[in-house]
UniProtKB/Swiss-Prot annotation:
Similarity-based family: Belongs to the CheD family.
Protein name: Probable chemoreceptor glutamine deamidase CheD
Function (record text): Probably deamidates glutamine residues to glutamate on methyl-accepting chemotaxis receptors (MCPs), playing an important role in chemotaxis.
Source organism per UniProt: Nitrosomonas europaea (strain ATCC 19718 / CIP 103999 / KCTC 2705 / NBRC 14298)
Pfam families noted in UniProt: CheD
Coiled-coil intervals: none
Enzyme class: hydrolase
EC number of the protein: 3.5.1.44
Keyword Hydrolase: yes
């Protein structure tokens, strides 16, 4: 059975002349193939982690640092940073990466929404991803975090190359609306009691 959180939006990028996968919030992707992983980030964060020696790399796209149920257990949903980072690293190792070779590049965490709580989410995501990687000894080779603009990211997992474009437009309603809707949903999940034996997918 395919993990529903594993990105499956494949396309061919004409400009970059390569196979590509677009990641949506709550998705991740790991590959050994010569391709590009792309996403658009507002207050969300993406970690691009790879082993340059083994040629294995992957990326995630998470919206909030952590989600816990009423028992204090981590909600297994890749829209939350704790699980998104854990599963990304686990899949990298399962596909042949070596932990001592892993390095990262991180992006996002922008203050693109009007509400103060949304600005806090971007900063919280930024602090979380830096702390997570530091605690696990995974160096951050490059980072572009926070700020006031959304970002479009193209990550080449075979060699770690990243292309970033900041979206300097006056109205980013699609990105903002999507993140607001997901943020409300995730905050509701994190704060409500989840019945024992159930899982958020």
């Amino acid at each position: 059975m395919v993990n529903p959180q594993f990105a499956s939006n494949f396309y061919f990028d004409q400009r970059l002349n390569t196979e590509a996968v677009k990641l949506l919030p709550g998705e991740y992707f790991v590959t050994t193939r010569n391709m590009v992983l792309s996403t658009v980030l507002g207050s969300c964060v993406s970690a691009c982690i790879y082993d340059g020696q083994s040629g294995v790399g992957g990326m995630n796209h998470f919206m909030l640092p952590r989600g816990e149920d009423d028992q204090g257990l981590q909600v297994e949903c890749a829209r939350f940073g704790g699980y998104a980072m854990d599963i990304l690293i686990r899949e990298l190792l399962r596909n042949g990466a070596h932990k001592e070779n892993l390095v990262s590049k991180v992006f996002g965490g922008g203050n693109v929404q009007r509400a103060m709580v949304s600005s806090m989410i971007g900063s919280q995501n930024t602090r979380f991803v830096k702390k997570y990687l530091a605690e696990r000894g995974i160096p951050i080779l490059a980072a572009d975090l926070e700020g006031n603009h959304p970002r479009k990211i193209h990550f080449f997992p075979k060699n770690g190359r990243v292309l970033q474009k900041k979206l300097y437009v006056s109205r980013n309603d699609t990105i903002v609306e999507r993140e607001q809707n997901y943020s409300r949903l995730l905050l509701s999940v994190a704060q409500s009691a989840i019945q024992p034996g159930t899982r958020e997918n």
